[in-house]
């Protein structure tokens, strides 16, 4: 998610520098992916807390624990929430056929190049077997939150605030 936000944020910042008065940016951008697929959003707090808790267990040495979200997040949920945080509209996930009908724009080609590694996650259905981690964390109070618009806004908002602060 953070790579997607950073790539999009960089494009939006260039636009906003040229047109500083713009609020909501309309950016017609087709991104290769499927709304029906999922991404595995995992808050860093959950990962750190889970790592610390599992590392304290004597029986965890040498084991593999996937600190993943047991309920993957549909692309149709996270994309509009991230766009809202970035104050942008017009971004949509499309299949490869969309680019056969109308070739990529320069911006789409640049964005695709920046996101090349991550496209596999936008198109595929990544599944992580997190049963060992869930078993190890049972009755500890450490649980990965279900991704809602509110949680995604918090995660994405934090990162956008960080990027904005760096460019000051």
Language model: regions and residue ranges:
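Mid/C-terminal beta-alpha module of Rossmann-like enzyme folds, strongest
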Residues: 50-117, 159-166
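Amphipathic alpha-helical segments that line or abut small-molecule/effector binding pockets
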Residues: 44-56, 149, 153
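NAD(P)-dependent short-chain dehydrogenase/reductase
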Residues: 1-39, 44-49, 82
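Residue-level signal for the nucleotide or nucleotide-sugar donor/cofactor binding architecture
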Residues: 42-45, 73, 128
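A hydrophobic C-terminal alpha-helical subdomain
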Residues: 11-31, 97-143
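Amphipathic terminal alpha-helices
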Residues: 129-168
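Hydrophobic alpha-helical scaffolding
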Residues: 37-41, 68, 123, 145
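Ca2+-coordinating acidic residues in Ca2+-binding motifs
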Residues: 46, 77, 132
């Amino acid at each position: 998610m953070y790579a997607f936000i950073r790539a999009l944020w960089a494009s939006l910042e260039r636009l906003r520098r040229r047109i500083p008065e713009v609020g909501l940016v309309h950016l017609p951008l087709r991104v290769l992916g499927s709304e029906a697929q999922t991404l595995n959003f995992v808050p860093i707090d959950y990962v750190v807390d889970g790592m610390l808790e599992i590392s304290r267990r004597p029986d965890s040495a040498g084991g593999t624990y996937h600190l993943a979200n047991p309920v993957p997040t549909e692309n149709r949920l996270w994309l509009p929430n991230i766009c809202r945080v970035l104050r942008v509209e017009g971004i949509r996930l499309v299949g490869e056929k969309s680019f056969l009908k109308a070739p990529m724009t320069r911006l789409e080609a640049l964005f695709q190049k920046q996101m090349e590694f991550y496209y596999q996650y936008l198109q595929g259905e990544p599944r992580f077997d997190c049963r060992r981690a869930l078993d190890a964390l049972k009755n500890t109070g450490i649980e990965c939150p279900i991704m809602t618009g509110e949680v995604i806004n918090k995660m994405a908002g934090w990162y956008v605030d960080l990027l904005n602060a760096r460019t000051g």
